[in-house]
Regions:
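Active-site loop-to-helix "anion-binding N-cap" substructures in soluble metabolic enzymes
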Residues: 1-258
Length: 258
């Protein structure tokens, strides 16, 4: 697969970590060590309370700020929820949707799809997460399961909108466990994801859509994972909380052979 059709994205997912003051300190350090020149796209998806601080700190950089979730509704009596238009107004570019940790709390494919549609309508770039459990992998239904998640998550997404999306493969069995899919395992699934997109939207769009790997990628294994032809970046958890480790992954993504 010729990667010239696609952008590489290294996106951090902070989950429920860091306060606004810690965010300010992190961004200040990151700016001092962030490589200069033309590099891959970079994003940091941070807790909602940290978004304003992150946006202000990174305004003059190439780092896009994102949220970790949004509500499917534009407004209303949804205590504790945040709408997509609020995130956009706050300065967000990206939003993570369908993460396994959200699905574990009862979020359904239908819920995820509704969030994808509203995020696109409001001009955000959705990072749609899909992935299988260890049991599903061991019983041989990984491709079937992920195909179902993709079709459900993209239901109603028009051809002109799918181009603005990113898909992240996050094997649930590798999230926060220290286990990582081998480069070959990760590539096999990412290749199958691209095949699903090809069937749904055609070869041109399948060539253009970026697919990230999101299962415990770190500064030690990033190069081998990113060298795979259908892996176009990473959705980084723990390693994105340390500026030096995050930058090493960015540097791995920009090696001439990637």
């Amino acid at each position: 697969m010729n990667r010239k059709y696609r952008k590489t994205l290294i996106a951090g997912n902070w989950k429920m970590n860091k306060t606004p003051s810690e965010t300010k300190a992190f961004m200040s350090e990151l700016k001092t060590i962030l490589p200069k020149g033309r590099w891959c796209d970079i994003a940091l998806c941070v807790p909602a309370v940290c978004i304003p601080t992150a946006v202000r700190a990174m305004r003059e950089t190439r780092v896009g700020i994102g949220a970790e979730n949004c509500n499917a509704n534009a407004s209303g009596a949804y205590t504790g929820e945040i709408a997509a238009n609020m995130l956009l107004d706050a300065g967000c570019k990206y939003v993570i949707l369908g993460h396994s940790e959200r699905r574990a709390m009862g979020e359904t494919d239908k819920d995820v799809n509704a969030k994808v549609l509203t995020a696109l309508e409001n001009g955000l770039v959705p990072i749609l997460c899909v992935g299988e459990t260890l049991e599903q992998r061991e019983t041989g239904i990984t491709t079937e399961w992920i195909t179902m998640q993709i079709k459900a998550g993209l239901n109603g997404v028009a051809e002109d909108k799918i181009r603005k999306m990113i898909i992240a493969y996050e094997p649930i069995w590798a999230i926060g466990t220290g286990k990582t899919a081998t480069p070959e395992q990760a590539e096999e699934v990412c290749e199958s994801i691209r095949a699903v997109i090809r069937k749904m939207y055609g070869a041109k769009i399948a060539r253009a859509i970026s697919i990230l790997y999101g299962g415990s990628m770190n500064d030690k294994n990033a190069y081998d994972l990113l060298a795979q032809p259908d892996i176009d970046g990473g959705l980084i958890g723990g390693a994105s909380l340390v500026p030096e480790k995050f930058v090493k992954i960015i540097e791995a993504a920009n090696q001439p052979t990637i």
